[in-house]
């Protein structure tokens, strides 16, 4: 066990996970920790509005593949992160959302800028946890970051402001990084059979292809099947547009060629996509989603499998 302050423990966990950039606006509820950022190699990017910080964090992670942190002052500042956090959630962007909270001693008594911050984000994050004891600061933060990475979505840590500057005995927690699991034998066998017998297979590539570093794998299977590749809404980066089999994005502001081609598919291989409405509902008067095709869906979130027919 080592003695250190709660903010030192917090920063050490950030370093363990390689978090080097934070975006947002820092208020009095987070100032003790921000003083440690420069020496820890963490760059804080101040913005004019909290929403900008969240949107930049989303864009940063989507373009670099590195998880970032967004911060705002408790109460009204945190409410400014609602739009970017929900956006990141639907974009499958892992992100650490840090929400300083009113002091634990005054919670429920109308503490300084007290807001139900956990309820505010409960349907916008894949995981959320409030620090209930200063000695558990590192443990909770480590778990929240891991959940964000595993769930490929924002995760929230809520920290009462009076938990900073406390000296604690602590042992830094280990990082337990789960390996990406393969599909079940029977499911993969059935998928292979469907693709082998397909007369006109079409691939739909989504965010998971990018996040899973699987663009080259997607290219290989497309070339093996000689299958055109459509990209999901907002995920043009999931397949190189210069490739001969690339036909563009589906749905809103999408490619008519992509819509016409996928409408003829007898098997659709949906890779790394939750099959959201913007990639499946009619566009430009074209009801393109193939009603009779077999759908092979591969996605990190099992709750989304089979949700869209």
Stretches with model-predicted labels:
Residues 1-309:
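N-terminal alpha/beta PP-like core and its mobile active-site loop of ThDP/TPP-dependent enzymes
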